[in-house]
Amino acid sequence: MPVVQGLIPINAEQIFEIGNCPRLALENHMVEKNYIRWLDSLTLDDIPLVGGKNASLGELAGSLTSDIRVAEGFAITAAAYRDLLESNALWPGMEQILTNTDWSDMEAAARESERLRKMIATAPLLSELDAEIRQAYLKLSQDHGRNIAVAVRSSATAEDLPGASFAGQHETFLNVHGAQNLVEAVRKCFASLFTQRAISYRINKGFDHQDVALSVGVQRMIRADRASSGVIFTLDTESGNRDIVMITGVWGLGEAIVQGIADPDEFLVHKPTLKLGHEHVLRHHIGSKEVKLVYAAASADEPTVWRKVGRSDQVKPCLADDEIIRLAKQAMAIETHYSERNGRPTPMDIEWAKDGPDGALYIVQARPETIHAPLDAGLLTQYHLDGDGPVILEGQAVGDRIGSGPVRLVKDGSELEKVGSGDILVATATTPDWEPAMKRSSAIITEHGGRTCHAAIVARELGIPVIVGASDATRLLKSGQEVTVDCSQGMTGRILNGIIPHSVHTVDIGKLEKAETDLMVNIANPNAAFRVAALPVAGVGLARIEFIITNEIKAHPMALLSPDQITDRGIRKKIAMLTSGYDSGSDYFVTRLAEGVATIAAAFYLRPVIVRTSDFKSNEYASLLGGRDFEQAENNPMIGFRGASRYVHPAYQDAFALECQALQRVRDDMGLSNVIVMIPFCRRIDEAKRVLQAMAQNGLERGRNGLEIYIMCEIPSNVVLIDEFAKLFDGFSIGSNDLTQLVLGVDRDSEILAADFEEEDPAVLAMIEQAIAGAHRHGLKCGICGQAPSDRPGFANWLVARQIDSISLSPDSVLGVMQRLARHQKSAKSRPSRRLAISAS
């Protein structure tokens, strides 16, 4: 919309539209504009004038490409708010209330904040302001239809600044029709500067109440009630990883996310590969989306109403993949613009809406992300549970912290006084104005909501662990019950019974002594990948896909390929439910496996990620849904039908083809070419050749697109014939557990022989030394990915002395082993050179 300067003529017919304004008369058809600024005339330099939210919208509307749509509208300046207080002489009385009230007293805070809001809400607006609001609304209506529906949003002058989000503190009004209703909404927005939550937040952040003013933004409503809407972050909200665009969405209006009422869909897009032209969604998580917020009829008492979402829409994503990619590109463009303007990287928090009638995607808000952006990236804090206990229930983790204490069930805001210091606040959902009670809590659990709702954002800012989407929490947990809330394991948060001790370790990565040998990490859970990737490691030495198959896919791949062969009708029904929304069972398997592997590969991009193809034993395969119809019972599965032998056997070769297709999709289609594929438990040279042939037939040809294929060196034949295996593969990874088992003839699962299972036995060490030397003879790398180097410093030192190329460790062992190895290597250099003795110390 063009900026309208100066005076605007008003005709007699427009008086009805504008309403009854005392200063407006037929003989004076001109109204001077003082308080209105059209959005596309604003920039970020106008924050003191129109607040952070409105200035940001103006920046988007006026400075970015036409690909980014911003709904037309105008801002009512912060001067209008200040003049309202001054013209009604409100501030002296308000200041007295603000000064004399104990804002930590919940009852007094609620009473006095309501009193402050009432003072503003009942004060008459300046007649000039009233007229200008109506006139601007008329102009907007002329462009888009009589009595156009508008969104009315507060925009504080201290809002959306680094370290200050003000998330959800001030009022928003949707689907506002008519000039009179708009004027009332503006008045309520001004009053919302003094909600209990807003007052408390300003006190905590050190803002003087008089220094913060409120502007109001008015925009044409996007008909997201007929489509979808949501939130975008240009980083991973839990780890702060900046290679990710995270998009959440629900059907209908975005308030369902903001209020934590609906469990949203969540989509991840990888920035570096998208920039290279790989337009693929990294990961889809489909939320339940059981309810949606839609516009009510114009005659209704409330402007919006909640509706149930049908089952078919609950399981369907609220955005198509091409729309997800389009939003990701827009978010990246916005981030780039703000970063260039600010002269520093500026991750963004963005709200989007899809218009039902025209299908277009709009950006309705954009602001700097305020939680991770200000943090020192060189500091790494790890939270570790030092014990265990029975898991009561699970949900989505917000943050990575751990908290424990007695449960305090809260039905609504009237019960917040019950929440004491150190309590675990449990509710169906929370709202941002619960912040004073949230501050007293050691953790929060809700039955609904997603990781981008306002309550989650505020909880991150407060440093409180939160679990959202924990179904039945208010039924399963009782007030006074002691529990531990664990968010340290990735996206899945756990509520455990009892008080379980935990430890916190913070290290400055820049000051760590680094080992000369590459340290890598073992990982299985994609949900933990972005957090683990913050460790100072050279990459992933072992990515186990068994976790993805067990927890994400859940079904035996052959059962997905041949569901008609499943004898149990109940299992057939479960598999049908799992695969609904996918083209076929094979499409389900390939998609879910590819997304899990891709998440790990993206987290560590461009570092190498060695992905081992499935290495379940037959009894483990049988435990998957439908598995018993495709697996034979074995007396000793540990050395039975596992690893490479399965891949070329008629009973499993079609399933292995699906694994290959998933890995090919990750590397070639999604652009994550840092994935190295590794074959486990390959007994014979002929078997290796047949496996490589099968891989090539399914898109994984060694050397194509830089593909490297490694082999696990975990069978004596791998060491004895290492010169032959070296001709077929690009690298080796020693599996010390299986190698020890097979060299010593000790069943690694046998309790009675546990004392004889010894990785540092001379026979095992001799095999490891031969393997390293054999790989190096052919110019190939040889690493190790067993547990022993984590537990035994002497063994790790011995490996380094044998010039092992890499040691892959569990994430919680990395920093300790790194520092021990660095000290050892430094000490070794200061001593005369000698061969290290084998030690189990």
Give the role of each language-model region.
Residues 23, 87, 91, 357, ...:
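Acidic, glycine-rich flexible loop/linker segments
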Residues 26-217, 226, 314-322, 326-327, ...:
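N-terminal beta-alpha lobe that positions the nucleotide/phosphoryl donor
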Residues 145, 149-151, 156-166, 170-174, ...:
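Conserved alpha/beta-domain cores
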Residues 166-200, 224-298, 363-394, 440-447, ...:
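Extended active-site and interfacial segments that coordinate phosphate-rich ligands
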Residues 244-347, 354, 396-400, 421, ...:
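Conserved catalytic alpha/beta cores of large enzymes that bind or transform nucleotide phosphates
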